[in-house]
UniProtKB/Swiss-Prot annotation:
The keyword Hydrolase applies. It comes from Rattus norvegicus (Rat). Coiled coil: none annotated. Its main location: cytoplasm. The lineage of its organism: Eukaryota, Metazoa, Chordata, Craniata, Vertebrata. This is Peroxisomal ATPase PEX6. PANTHER family: AAA-FAMILY ATPASE (PTHR23077), PEROXISOMAL ATPASE PEX6 (PTHR23077:SF9).
Amino acid sequence: MALAVLHVLEPFPTETPPLAVLLPPGGPWPVTGVGLVLALRPASESPAGPALLVAAVEGSGAQCEQRGPGPPPLLVSRTLLRVLALSPGARVRARPVRRPPALGWALLGTSPGPGLGPRVGPLLVRRGETLPVPGSRVLETRPALQGLLGPGTRLAVTELQGRTKLDPESRDHNHPPPPPVVSSFAVSHSIRQLRGVLGGTGDALGVSRSCLRSLGLFQGEWVWVARVGELPNTSQPHLAQVQVLEPRWDLSARLGPNSGQPGEPLADGLVFVPATLAFNLGCDPLEVGELRIQRYLEDSTAAEDKGSCSLLPGPPFARELHIEVLPSPHCGVNGKYDHVLYQHFHTPRVVQEGDVLCVSTAGQVEILEGSLERLPRWREVFFKVKKTVGEAPDGPASAFLADTTHTSLYLAGTTLSRVPPLPSGRSPPWDSLSPPGLEALVNELCAVLKPHLQPGGTLLTGTSCVLLQGPPGSGKTTAVTAACSRLGLHLLKVPCSSLCADSSRTVETKLQTTFSRARRCRPVVLLLTALDLLGRDRDGLGEDARVVATLRHLLLDEDPLSRCPPLMVVATTSRVQDLPTDVRTAFPHELEVPVLSESQRLSVLQALTAHLPLGQEVNLSQLARRCAGFVVGDLYALLTHASRAACTRIKAAGLAMSEEDEGELCAAGFPLLAEDFGQALDQLQTAHSQAVGAPKIPSVSWHDVGGLQDVKKEILETIQLPLEHPELLSLGLRRSGLLLHGPPGTGKTLLAKAVATECSLTFLSVKGPELINMYVGQSEENVREVFARARAAAPCIIFFDELDSLAPSRGRSGDSGGVMDRVVSQLLAELDGLHSTQDVFVIGATNRPDLLDPALLRPGRFDKLVFVGASEDRASQLRVLSAITRKFKLEASVSLMNVLDCCPPQLTGADLYSLCSDAMMTALKRRVRDLEEGLEPRSSALLLTMEDLLQAAARLQPSVSEQELLRYKRIQRKFAAC
């Protein structure tokens, strides 16, 4: 993509769409007879993501002066600048689109009134944009977010509810709003209070245009800003400029879920404060608080400007500026900072004694050469102002401007200090000071670390070591990063896998080097990830005593100098039980990552999809409900899999696209649909089940279960109701155990599988004998492991088949050692602990409930007994037979009721399944015989005839005799009377 410069053309031609560009004659992109489409994106953005497709035309007013060599100009309206979130003169990357994507389907919203009228040629449209027809808007497009609306586009029209908000394109942009006017008699000594919020870019305060008028200030005017309620000696005022922040129409928001609507305007009493300025003011990053704004009144010392009738007062320039380097984990004290500082102060900067300066190193190769990181990146370097020399103005504090022309810069050694929170370059959810879903964990971390940063923190006797445990991908590192940003701490992240070595001596040396590196950049948090990898011998079976002793000594270092400023250690692990005892006891604080609730999962999904184009049918609330048991990393993987599914869907749509067409479609962007999320969710749930050892079961729905309506109702009341309406069970009165009993072959296992499928639950099937082990204590461990896997895969159903073989009555078994009694006791203990786990359910199945230990049937355990009997009447048998033959191809003459009339009166579901299997085998034999004789073509379908079913019915023998059925009914009456 070639570089181009945007020039605002005012007034913009009314006959040209506001989101079009005008090309000066003789430019690099000649316009053909059908016009030209350009793909635009800001030059600062990465080439990933959609670009803005705009029409480029040549007009009579497209004249622009070309000042020497450089990027070609593009004449645009102010509307297009707002869409791209750029200012006049900004650079963009532009390339011609040879074949813009043709839209196959579009949903249009219209207001009550005249129709759309006839189509006139292909029209370049975008999702969320108003059409030339009054009162109409593009609500949804397929397959791309923007493209050509032509004769081949299928249209769906709906009526817009309520008053439609107009796009900025529908307004009159030929007459821009007048600039703010401030009277000459404005009260210059007025002091105002505004509520500060962390945000904005650069070094200036951001306010709304109306707020600037109410303050009586000019754009770019200098003001004193200070915290309200501070004592005079605790916080000095700081100097800053005031800039107007307009609502931004960025491209991601335009093509996203809220397409076509501008950003919320800044409130009048609100001011955006950059992170560095808020830190120097001593503000809390989460709650900047009330700020006092006062106009800077000192007479300007700048040279007289002959072209202006008035000058805004500004601070003087400093003659000398003495700064100190703040060592950080990624930049040492011996770095080459001359060129970096020269580039930074090429623009005049405000400096005050005691301030921390944040200097960007982007594009400076020498910084990468001196970086301490294995994979260096361009980060920020911090300096602290030690002294300023100049003619101090009479004001609340001594503030100067420093630049390369008026100021001599002196680098005066190093010092230790906290630093302001700055973005790390990752996506917004991970850069947040309160990551969605992890707010409570970050608050706990800050509460543990903050006392060591107080003036009396050196008097604390305990060490500042925190052990953070949670499953992989649960957000442990993200939470630690957010806590460090809140507290202004450096973060040194060290994977423990990089500390492992062949010999204990090498591991010991690496540990000591890591802690020494951390001490040089205090106050710092040393983050040791996967701590369970340390302290084990080479075989991984025993402990390495030398490494454990060294690590414990470093963690419990009582040197007072190492705690001022402090060195704090946070270690993460997903297997806390694998930590050596001496290492674990060195951490006085242990925190656990909590399980995400449904509301927290929704907030994570909303943050991850904030800048993604979603289909109108995507329901994030329903998606969050289906993602129960997912951690933050799983939700991020869900978005990744959904994006891949969307790419696969477009490629499989039957569109014969070349590589160039695929590139144009990616530039136009395409939405993520509900089917993409559904496919991604199925993939993740399958992988999740395999990770926890859950078997992959076939998809069984209620349609596959014939009859048993009363049994279905009992199961749904026990399991589905707590999942769909948890607020109804807020008192904690819930059942988590369900026992299905009855004759064999009546569908008990099929019912459990159908519940797991219909309720979107993980299914853990456990056969009773497979938990029994010959070693002492191993059988109980197997029971504990089953419930631990279920809690990790929640919401989950544990299905114990043949429960009578696993939990017989205690005291009656003749096994040596009493293993069955201990297994029953362990099972009872695990069932009692399910009340603290909301989304784990236990279903047991047995033919002989009278053989079970009576303690299992007490309230709070398997307290809900459901009898699953054989089908005795023809109506219920017909429902079962219809469910089994639902996927069969039956001949038109087949009557299932006539087949049942030829069967024994009492049949179980297994008997009817055997009937269908026998009939299908007869049909297969007939089909093979007909194919060999050439009576049927090979392409014909296999049909099940009435004769096949009648032959199978004649050979059918019930699997359960009448005497056995009577015995099962007596057992049912016995337990029903209890």
